[in-house]
Amino acid sequence: MSTVNASMTVIGAGSYGTALAITLARNGHEVVLWGHDPKHIATLQHDRCNVAFLPDVPFPDSLHLESDLATALAASRNILVVVPSHVFGQVLHQIKPLMRADARIVWATKGLEAETGRLLQDVAREVLGDDIPLAVISGPTFAKELAAGLPTAISLASTDQTFSDDLQHLLHCGKSFRVYSNPDFIGVQLGGAVKNVIAIGAGMSDGIGFGANARTALITRGLTEMSRLGEALGADPATFMGMAGLGDLVLTCTDNQSRNRRFGMMLGQGMDVMGAQEKIGQVVEGYRNTKEVRELAHRFGVEMPITEEIYQVLYCGKNAREAALTLLGRSRKEERSSS
């Protein structure tokens, strides 16, 4: 690819990274999309669409494919990272020596650092230093609908007001894509991780056959767990009533486009964890997020019974129905209690 002066370089050519790149290009911006597999990038360039995940959405002319990381990063100061959470830190280490001096980083990754449960902002600061502007986007966004130009809304939080304003300008499209700024950097990140866990639980409930009442109760109590953990970390509880909290939670718990929900449904129907992951065929973020969110909750002394039971199913071999009955058998509580 010849040198491009791009408004954004997108790191990660999976379904969501591709959808965001398409959205940016459709907004009239020059965009570079980089993926780690040169063969995959060559296929995208040849087909001018992502046949595997978004087969009916052609790439705009202003979307440029690139397999050379240095070339991709030289094209723009604005870098949008869209990779699974368990490789987030690894990717930042990879791009750090190749970034422009004026680089700014935004990510659409939803999750926490593998094993440690740290927020991704802490990973980014450790790898990239304290001076680089950071931002995160999160909210109810299925890649297929976003790429198709169907109405979508997200939350955006940043450490830098100028960067936040620039990102709103780049992403916001009045016809289909609304971007709401939010000063709560912690809350916007955390919502995307916890909702993955609760979505697995909602899927389990439906897989068992518990019905709409149970699913709705689980979503509601899951939101309580999300808010409880968020407050302990210093987030604004109001954030969890917005796009990055309730919005993403409802979407992921109720629609079968969600891998986490489908994964949970298979577990509820009796499939083992490995078999369910293989059948999904893509990364199920909630599997790792469950372990990470549980670790974070223990570290801050926050009780999260739904998360705990999902962890028991995923990592300790507990039966999904047994886990559900454990939750139902808990002692009576006040609705607004801290446990």
Swiss-Prot record:
Sn-glycerol 3-phosphate binds at K110, G139, T141, K195, D248, S258, R259, N260. It is an enzyme of class 1 (oxidoreductase). NADPH binds at S15, Y16, H36, K110, A143, R259, V283, E285. The keyword Disulfide bond does not apply. Signal peptide: none annotated. GO terms for molecular function: glycerol-3-phosphate dehydrogenase [NAD(P)+] activity; NAD binding. It catalyses: sn-glycerol 3-phosphate + NAD(+) = dihydroxyacetone phosphate + NADH + H(+); sn-glycerol 3-phosphate + NADP(+) = dihydroxyacetone phosphate + NADPH + H(+). The active site is at K195 (proton acceptor). GO terms for biological process: carbohydrate metabolic process; glycerol-3-phosphate biosynthetic process; glycerol-3-phosphate catabolic process; glycerophospholipid biosynthetic process. PROSITE patterns: NAD_G3PDH (PS00957). One of its GO terms (cellular component) is cytosol. Keywords: Cytoplasm, Lipid biosynthesis, Lipid metabolism, NAD, NADP, Nucleotide-binding, Oxidoreductase, Phospholipid biosynthesis, Phospholipid metabolism. It is found in: Cytoplasm. Pathway: Membrane lipid metabolism; glycerophospholipid metabolism. Its EC number is 1.1.1.94. Catalyzes the reduction of the glycolytic intermediate dihydroxyacetone phosphate (DHAP) to sn-glycerol 3-phosphate (G3P), the key precursor for phospholipid synthesis. Belongs to the NAD-dependent glycerol-3-phosphate dehydrogenase family. PANTHER family: GLYCEROL-3-PHOSPHATE DEHYDROGENASE, GLYCEROL-3-PHOSPHATE DEHYDROGENASE [NAD(+)] 2, CHLOROPLASTIC. This is Glycerol-3-phosphate dehydrogenase [NAD(P)+]. It comes from Enterobacter sp. (strain 638). The lineage of its organism: Bacteria, Pseudomonadati, Pseudomonadota, Gammaproteobacteria, Enterobacterales. The gene is gpsA.
